[in-house]
């Protein structure tokens, strides 16, 4: 059932936790999963309140919420069931879940919701459930109340310990004393023993240290002291001291006890004497006895009282001592805990500081990384943009574009377009703003280039000799005067103040950098006032609390100027509202008491008594209000408090600020409050903005001068963050130690200590924020104090305090000296200015007053310029007054005096020597002319920028169009054709011709004709494609793009000309109104007919002149002049003529003529306007003389007019109306007497009118020259742009023609190559196998595709093994193996039968090819000799060994290789059966592999070489495997024993032992007998009889000798041959002693028995192995029998059959009968 429920929960419901039957009870013990199941069935609506925790509260909550839902489903669920589930009772959760599963399935079938089920339930059940739940709830509440009452009762019970009896106490104390004594004795004995051992060790160490002193000195620094017994010795010594002290105390107590006993004894003696005396007195009367008894009783009571009082005093003393000791212990514990807490807090502070430092470093890194990434992106954008335009412009990027991109890159603006600047966009995005910024930057740069005539607008070669127009200084002066008249407040001169010797500065630094300490030291040595902002704020608040009244008069206007911030706060109500009337913040949790105080303050502030307070008290009130509201004091309020304090300091006294300002805003406010920096800077900036840019006044500078700083010096006490934290910790540590030391001593100064404690806590809490705030604000402050003038001095504050103070004092003394020198220099400059300015001030006082009051006002405002005019006009007046000349002589005298200064020529208008006319003008005129000029300037600049922007965009469009034209034409040339289809069809037909017809002449002729037809068809295709390409080029040329582009470009340049003409017209109008107003004339009416520069009409539509605002010029003129124009030879077309391009050039010349005509028209319009203005001046002058003739009827007026005309002659261009100027003296009939004053006034007016006219015309002519120059520049620029555009377009058209011709020639050449290839194959009568590819202009033979398959290559024959040097082939070996396996399956055969078989195979079966030819000449003696070499126990032969030997050559295995092969076989033999299959055999491999380097022959008909080693590996498995099993099994140990054979008999035995044991067995020392045997064997060697084998035998002997030498040299380790060997393994190694009658194939049932078994058993028993258990190899090898057996055992000797074969061949060769093998050897 549990599995069903788990499947239902995990798969169907998929609850949040996987449920298994083992953890079923635990999973549902908290009720969360039950709630989740009900929630999935929409029954548990409050499932969000369930908890997954396994706490008791969570379980109670979950099951309380589950109960009504389970009852709703009709399940039985109460406290017992819940407790069973909570306690994980087996089966409880399963039972409930099963019931829930059934109930939910029923609900699922009915389809009812939880609410419907609840409504369908009877009301009785619901009522019962509610009663049960209420009863349970009441029961829980009662139980809880009862538990609380019992807990209170238990807590109220006082546990009184039961006193112990005196006897038990004394016994326990006695036991404790005995125990302590015993422990002391034990410790003393141990100490004595330990000291004795220490002395011995020290003696030994001293003796050793003398011998190894040098090595100890070298290694002591490197070794670690892992164990030290100093602490242990100290503890023992301390304990000994304590024991000695205890003994002394015990002696004292014993002595005190003896003294007490002695005193008690004396008391007893005295009592005894008294008793004796009493007894004697008792003899007296009864009354005396009663008296004595009473006295004795009183005495006893007195004694008792005395003892009680002594006992109480002792108790009091013990209590005081205990309290004192407890206080000391408590203080020590508190100090220790405080130190621990302080260390932890310090560590936390350091961690927080390091974390903040890391965060700041990360922020800086991210910021720098972002900047670098942004720069890198912009560099990539620039590179890609350059690459794109190199592609567009053929690597010839225009200089203007590159310059614009560099500007954008240096400005950090993206080069690529972020978004399109549409006009309908209402809300600009970030990309939109970036595009607008980029556009504005490029527009401004283009405008500056145009204005300054640099860059793209630099003067061309034609205008290099002509000088550019100069600045119109007259217009600049006029505009400046108008601006000053319009804004007179900007020209008011400020009152200068006398410089002060007081030094002003501030000292800044991090928290606890030593600012206050340094200032205290500085204050002791210098008369300097220190201002601390914290102290000033506290004093201001205190002044408010004390209601300090203002004892000073109201501030004057000068004070208002010096301190605008304070006075604004004092006077302005709006600022009071902004600063003080702060609405309460909703998050502020102020108490009602604070609210009442704030309301009281508001009422007090609104009263009249608040205004009577001093300024400091008012500022303190505002500060307190901000602090009460939980806000910081604003910077402006702090600066006001500080400035108010500075005002109270005497002017000549120096002052220094302590730690202020700390932010840039505070520094700016302080600078503004002390110097008015911001107000003056804004005035200068506003004046600079109002300055005209098109015309400048050379006498005024537009640069904003930097104002001096309010401070003379700023000192930074530089310390590191760690030093600040360390100083904070030191202060807090001292405070903690001070608190602990004075905690219990009367507690003096509790309030002060509490304040210091709160300050230290506040310091510690805010030290991190203060440091971070300083680090954030200091870079801006450093820039503020070093930018205009470097007044900052950094001092390292981490040095000694006295040295730091000394450094600061030196800096202050230096600043004091510098300030004194500066003040003296300023005073000297002012004195020199006064002396120099005194003489020019006298002539105006001596000169007579002017005629009008306006000129007097002009004198007051412009003191210098009128002075020059007055000095010129004073001399004739002085002569007229002081000379007393008659009235008739005065004009003569003036006429005579005027031509006298002929040496210096009169200054020209606009030069530096020219004195500008500054006659008064109407007050309302500047208010009209200044906005009018601003409109002129703004419209001119915007017009120029817009046109230049369109020209810039036009350049981009031209490049894009030309690139698209080139690429589209190239794609058109590369459009696909159908030539390949014809070529493929021809190739298929050509290859399908039968081979027997290739040599037929008619066939060849037919094929040649087909080639000609193919060529003609391909030629037709090329011709058609060429005609289509030419038509496409002609269509591109005939497009109207070039004409439209030229027309648009011309219109842009015409717009530039229009802008210049408009500027000139507006400037002329402004100058005309200005000078006419100066002459008190009425301005002329505004003529609305402005000159319009015509534009080019782009489309051919005819529009009436009434519908046009701007005149249009038709594109192509129908006049005979345009039709007769011939193109200039060599202008654009070079080489052969091209009619379409000639038409383009003709159109360009027409456009060039239109451009020149338009320029000439604009230039002529400007000249006409100047001429009209001059004519108007002359006309007005002609009209004015009749008005003057009524007053001036003397002939001298004619002379004056002639003089005026002589002055005006060089200034005019046309002098056609001189007759009119001479008509005035004709009208004079009778002279009238004129007074000298009237004469002087008339002369002055005439001179003024002449100067106004001269200045006006000079300004107008300067503007005309500038406009004409600009028009000339625009004309040349337009011509160069249009010529460049036409040149680029014609180059593209020519390039298209070049591509077309080149492609056509390439296609024809490809067709020619194809024809030659086809004719070659026809003549050579060969097919074309590879595909011929002819597409577009490419022709080649595709070597990857063949149209018909190649003939199949011949198959290579299989490899065949050949006989070489008498070696048996693999086939021969397999045949011999099969025959021997049939005869002797066990591998052992009789030697007689073996030799007979070999003889029969050699002599009788000659056609079977069982042996090579070299074996056919073996005699019976040779075969018997071979048999004797293979004989085992003189009777049998191992035919497997024979086949292994005859299979040579194969690589002889070394002992290590055999062991490695054995380990690989064992690793694959997982069952350790000793056998493996063929697959495992191939996987493990032998010591040699069959992967030989086989050379594949080049001839495909030649077979591959035979891989003999690979076949040998397979043959060895067939040779040694047991084929009777399925699959065949190989005994790998037995096989490796065969391969252990060695030419050296002894070595072969040891190799076999190593293979059997599985590890290397070292050889024992050889005996002389063994050496003798080897010598005898070597003497029998037949090498001497056969000289042919001498060399090979000598080589083998040499190898054997080297191997023996190696074995001799091999060192035998001590633990060598310790491996154990068993009896079975030993019998397996020496298996040659098996007596087996295996002469025929029917003897397999016979049992084998080893002849060495009995001897081995005896050997094992001799060596101690009674039960024949395995023994060590080294022990076994020491036994004499084993040594003798190893020395004489020859089964592991590798027989040398090759020697017998060579001897047989040698014998045959001597008889003249050569074997086939020798013949083959000789041939080779």
Swiss-Prot record:
Coiled-coil positions are: 170-203, 255-351, 665-691, 995-1021
Q: Which InterPro entries match?
A: CH_2, CH_dom, CH_dom_sf, EF-hand-dom_pair, P-loop_NTPase, SPEF2_C, SPEF2_D5, Sperm_flagellar-bone_growth
Tissues with expression: Highly expressed in testis, where it primarily localizes to late spermatocytes, round spermatids and elongating spermatids (at protein level). Found in Sertoli cells of the testis (at protein level). Expressed at lower levels in epididymis (at protein level). Detected in lung, brain, liver and kidney. Also detected in bone, cartilage, trachea, pituitary gland and eye. Expressed in osteoblasts and chondrocytes.
Disordered as annotated region, ranges: 545-576, 828-910, 1177-1241, 1580-1618, 1704-1724
Q: Where is the Calponin-homology (CH) domain?
A: 1-105
Q: Where is the composition biased (Basic and acidic residues)?
A: 558-576, 853-862, 1177-1194, 1592-1607
Q: Where is the composition biased (Basic residues)?
A: 1210-1221
Localization in the cell: Cell projection, Cilium, Flagellum; Cytoplasm; Cytoplasm, Cytoskeleton; Golgi apparatus
Pfam (any one): SPEF2_D5
Q: Entry's PROSITE patterns? A: CH
The Gene Ontology CC terms held by the record are: cytoplasm; extracellular region; Golgi apparatus; manchette; sperm flagellum; sperm midpiece
Keywords assigned: Cell projection, Cilium, Coiled coil, Cytoplasm, Cytoskeleton, Differentiation, Flagellum, Golgi apparatus, Spermatogenesis
Task: Region Interaction with IFT20: list its residue ranges.
Answer: 1228-1580
Q: Identify the Gene3D superfamilies for this entry.
A: Calponin-like domain, P-loop containing nucleotide triphosphate hydrolases
Oligomer status and interactors:
Interacts (via C-terminus) with IFT20. Interacts with DYNC1I2.
Name-wise, this protein is Sperm flagellar protein 2
Q: What is the lineage of its organism?
A: Eukaryota, Metazoa, Chordata, Craniata, Vertebrata
């Amino acid at each position: 059932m549990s599995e069903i429920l788990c499947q239902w929960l995990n798969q169907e419901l998929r609850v949040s936790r996987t449920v298994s039957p083992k953890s079923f009870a635990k999973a549902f013990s908290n009720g969360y999963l039950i709630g989740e199941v009900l929630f999935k069935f929409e029954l548990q609506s409050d499932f969000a309140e369930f908890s997954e925790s396994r706490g008791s509260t969570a379980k109670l909550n979950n099951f309380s919420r589950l109960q009504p839902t389970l009852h709703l489903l009709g399940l039985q669920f109460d406290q017992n069931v819940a407790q069973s589930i909570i306690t994980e009772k087996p089966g409880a959760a399963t039972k409930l879940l099963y019931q829930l599963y059934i109930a939910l399935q029923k609900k699922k079938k009915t389809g009812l919701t939880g609410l419907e089920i609840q409504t369908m339930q009877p009301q009785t059940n619901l009522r019962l459930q509610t009663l049960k739940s209420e009863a349970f709830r009441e029961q829980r509440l009662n139980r809880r109340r009862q538990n609380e009452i019992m807990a209170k009762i238990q807590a109220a019970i006082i546990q009184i310990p039961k006193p112990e009896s005196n006897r038990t106490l004394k016994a326990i104390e006695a036991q404790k004393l005995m125990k302590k004594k015993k422990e002391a004795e034990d410790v003393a004995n141990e100490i004595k023993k330990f000291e004795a051992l220490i002395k011995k060790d020290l003696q030994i160490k001293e003796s050793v240290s003398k011998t190894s002193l040098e090595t100890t000195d070298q290694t002591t620094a490197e070794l670690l002291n892992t164990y030290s017994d100093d602490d242990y010795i100290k503890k023992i010594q301390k304990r000994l001291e304590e024991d000695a002290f205890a003994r002394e105390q015990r002696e004292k107590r014993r002595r005190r006890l003896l003294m007490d006993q002695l005193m008690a004894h004396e008391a007893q003696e005295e009592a005894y004497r008294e008793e004796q005396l009493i007894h004697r007195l008792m003899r007296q009367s009864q009354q005396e006895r009663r008296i004595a008894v009473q006295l004795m009783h009183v005495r006893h009571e007195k004694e008792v009282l005395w003892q009680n009082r002594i006992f109480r005093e002792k108790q009091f003393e013990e209590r005081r001592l205990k309290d004192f000791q407890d206080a000391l212990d408590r203080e020590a514990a508190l100090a220790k805990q405080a130190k621990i807490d302080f260390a932890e807090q310090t560590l936390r502070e350091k961690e927080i500081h390091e974390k903040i430092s890391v965060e700041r470093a990360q922020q800086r890194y991210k910021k720098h990384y972002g900047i670098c990434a942004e720069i890198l992106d912009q560099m990539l954008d620039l590179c890609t943009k350059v690459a794109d335009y190199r592609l567009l412009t053929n690597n010839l990027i225009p200089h203007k574009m590159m310059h614009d991109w560099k500007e954008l890159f240096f400005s950090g603006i993206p080069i690529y377009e972020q978004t399109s600047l549409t006009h309908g966009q209402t809300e600009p995005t970030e990309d939109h703003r970036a595009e607008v910024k980029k556009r504005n930057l490029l527009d401004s740069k283009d405008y500056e280039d145009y204005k300054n005539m640099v860059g793209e607008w630099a003067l061309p070669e034609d205008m290099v000799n002509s000088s550019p127009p100069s600045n119109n200084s007259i217009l600049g002066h006029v505009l400046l005067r108008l601006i000053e008249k319009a804004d007179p407040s900007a020209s008011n001169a400020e009152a200068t103040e006398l410089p002060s010797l007081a030094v002003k500065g501030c000292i800044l630094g991090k928290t606890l950098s030593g600012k206050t300490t340094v200032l205290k030291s500085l204050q002791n040595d210098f008369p300097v006032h220190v201002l601390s902002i914290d102290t000033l704020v506290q004093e201001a608040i205190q002044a408010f609390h004390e209601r300090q009244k203002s004892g000073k008069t109201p501030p004057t206007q000068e004070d208002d100027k010096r301190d605008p911030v304070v006075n604004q706060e004092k006077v302005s109500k709006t600022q009071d509202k902004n600063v003080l009337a702060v609405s309460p913040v909703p998050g502020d949790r102020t108490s009602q008491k604070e609210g009442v105080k704030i309301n009281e303050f508001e009422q007090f502030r609104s009263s009249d008594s608040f205004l009577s307070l001093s300024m400091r008290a008012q500022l303190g009130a505002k500060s307190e209000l901000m602090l009460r509201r939980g806000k910081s004091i604003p910077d402006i309020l702090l600066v006001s408090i500080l400035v108010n304090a500075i005002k109270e300091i005497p002017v000549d006294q120096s002052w220094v600020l302590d730690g202020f300002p700390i932010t840039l805003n505070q520094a700016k406010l302080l600078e503004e409050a002390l110097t008015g920096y911001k107000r003056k800077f804004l005035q200068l900036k506003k004046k600079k903005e109002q300055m005209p840019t098109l015309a400048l006044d050379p006498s005024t500078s537009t640069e904003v001068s930097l104002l001096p700083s309010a401070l003379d010096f700023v000192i930074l006490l530089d310390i590191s963050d760690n030093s600040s934290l360390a100083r904070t910790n030191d202060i807090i540590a001292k405070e903690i130690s001070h608190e602990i030391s004075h905690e219990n001593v009367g507690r003096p100064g509790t309030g002060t200590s509490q304040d210091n404690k709160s300050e230290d806590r506040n310091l510690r809490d805010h030290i991190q924020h203060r440091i971070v705030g300083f680090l954030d604000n200091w870079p801006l402050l450093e820039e503020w104090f070093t930018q205009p003038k470097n007044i900052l001095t950094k001092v390292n504050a981490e040095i000694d305090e006295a040295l730091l103070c000394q450094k600061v004092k030196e800096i202050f003394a230096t600043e004091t000296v510098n300030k004194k020198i500066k003040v003296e220099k300023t005073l000297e400059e002012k004195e020199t200015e006064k002396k120099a300015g005194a003489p020019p001030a006298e002539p105006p006082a001596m000169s007579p007053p002017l005629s009008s009051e306006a000129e007097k006002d002009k004198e007051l405002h412009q003191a210098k310029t009128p002075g020059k005019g007055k000095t010129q006009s004073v001399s004739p007046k002085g002569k007229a007054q002081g000379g007393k000349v008659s009235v008739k002589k005065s004009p003569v005298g003036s006429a005579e005096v005027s031509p006298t200064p002929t040496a210096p020529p009169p200054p020209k208008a606009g030069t530096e020597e020219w004195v500008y006319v500054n006659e008064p003008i109407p007050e309302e005129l500047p208010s009209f002319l200044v906005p009018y000029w601003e409109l002129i300037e703004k419209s001119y600049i915007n017009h120029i920028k817009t046109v230049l922007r369109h020209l810039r965009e036009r350049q981009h469009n031209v490049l894009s169009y030309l690139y698209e034209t080139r690429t589209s034409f190239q794609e058109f040339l590369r459009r696909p054709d159908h030539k390949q289809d014809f070529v493929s069809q021809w190739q298929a037909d050509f290859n399908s011709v039968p081979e027997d017809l290739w040599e037929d002449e008619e066939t060849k002729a037919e094929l040649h004709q087909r080639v000609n037809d193919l060529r003609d068809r391909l030629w037709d295709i090329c011709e058609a494609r060429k005609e289509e390409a030419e038509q496409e080029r002609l269509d591109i040329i005939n497009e109207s793009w070039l004409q439209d582009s030229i027309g648009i470009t011309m219109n842009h340049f015409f717009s530039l000309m229009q802008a210049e003409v408009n500027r000139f017209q507006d400037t002329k109008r402004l100058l005309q109104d200005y000078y006419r107003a100066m002459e008190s004339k009425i301005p002329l009416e505004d003529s609305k007919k402005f000159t319009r520069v015509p534009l080019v009409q782009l489309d051919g539509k005819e529009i009436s002149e009434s519908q046009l605002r701007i005149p249009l010029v038709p594109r192509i003129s129908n006049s005979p002049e345009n039709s007769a124009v011939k193109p200039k030879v060599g202008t654009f077309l070079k080489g052969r003529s091209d009619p379409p391009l000639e038409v383009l050039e003709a159109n360009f010349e027409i456009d060039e003529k239109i451009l020149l005509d338009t320029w000439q028209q604009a230039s002529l319009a400007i000249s006409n306007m100047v001429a009209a203005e001059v004519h108007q001046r002359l006309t007005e002058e002609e009209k004015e003389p009749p008005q003057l003739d009524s007053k001036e009827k003397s002939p001298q007026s004619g002379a004056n007019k002639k003089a005026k005309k002589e002055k005006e002659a060089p200034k005019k261009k046309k002098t056609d109306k001189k007759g009119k100027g001479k008509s005035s003296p004709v009208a004079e009939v009778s002279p009238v007497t004129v007074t000298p004053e009237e004469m002087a006034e008339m002369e002055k007016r005439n001179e003024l009118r002449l100067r106004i006219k001269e200045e006006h015309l000079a300004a107008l002519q300067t503007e005309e020259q500038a406009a004409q120059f600009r028009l000339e520049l625009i004309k040349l620029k337009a011509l160069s742009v249009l010529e460049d555009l036409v040149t680029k377009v014609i180059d593209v058209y020519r390039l298209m023609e070049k591509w077309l011709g080149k492609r056509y020639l390439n296609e024809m050449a490809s067709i020619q190559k194809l024809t030659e290839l086809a004719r070659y194959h026809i003549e050579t009568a060969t097919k074309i196998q590879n595909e011929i590819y002819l597409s577009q202009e490419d022709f080649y033979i595709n070597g990857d595709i063949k149209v018909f398959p190649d003939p199949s290559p011949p198959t290579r024959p299989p490899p065949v093994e050949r006989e070489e040097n008498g070696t048996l082939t693999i086939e021969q070996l397999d045949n011999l193996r099969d025959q021997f396996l049939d005869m002797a399956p066990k591998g052992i055969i009789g030697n007689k039968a073996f030799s007979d078989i070999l003889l029969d195979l050699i002599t009788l079966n000659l056609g079977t090819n069982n042996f090579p030819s070299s074996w056919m000449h073996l005699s019976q003696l040779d075969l018997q000799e071979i048999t004797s070499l293979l004989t085992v126990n003189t009777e049998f032969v191992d035919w497997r060994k024979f086949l292994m030997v005859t299979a040579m050559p194969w690589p002889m295995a070394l002992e290590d290789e055999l062991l490695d092969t054995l380990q690989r076989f064992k690793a694959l033999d997982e069952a350790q059966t000793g056998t493996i299959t063929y697959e495992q055999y191939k996987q493990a491999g032998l010591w040699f592999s069959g992967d030989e380097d086989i050379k594949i022959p080049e001839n495909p008909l030649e077979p591959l070489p035979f891989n003999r080693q690979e076949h040998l590996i397979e043959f060895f498995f067939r040779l040694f495997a047991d084929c009777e099993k399925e699959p065949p099994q190989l005994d790998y140990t037995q096989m490796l024993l065969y391969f252990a054979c060695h030419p050296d008999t002894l070595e072969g035995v040891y190799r076999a032992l190593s293979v059997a044991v599985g590890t290397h067995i070292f050889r024992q020392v050889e005996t002389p007998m063994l050496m003798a045997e080897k010598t005898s064997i070597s003497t029998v060697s037949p090498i001497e009889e056969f000289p042919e084998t001498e060399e090979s035998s000598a080589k083998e002997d040499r190898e054997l000798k080297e191997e023996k030498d190696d074995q001799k040299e091999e060192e035998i380790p001590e633990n060598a041959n310790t491996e154990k060997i068993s009896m079975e393994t030993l019998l397996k190694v020496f298996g040659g002693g098996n007596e087996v009658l295996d002469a025929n194939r029917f003897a397999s049932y016979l049992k084998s028995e080893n002849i060495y078994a009995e001897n081995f058993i005896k050997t094992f028993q001799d060596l101690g192995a009674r039960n024949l258990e395995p023994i060590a190899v080294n022990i076994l090898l020491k036994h004499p029998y084993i040594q003798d057996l190893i020395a004489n055992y020859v089964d592991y000797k590798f027989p040398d059959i090759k020697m017998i074969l060579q001897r047989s061949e040698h014998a045959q060769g001597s008889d003249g009968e050569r074997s086939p093998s020798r013949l083959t050897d000789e041939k080779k």
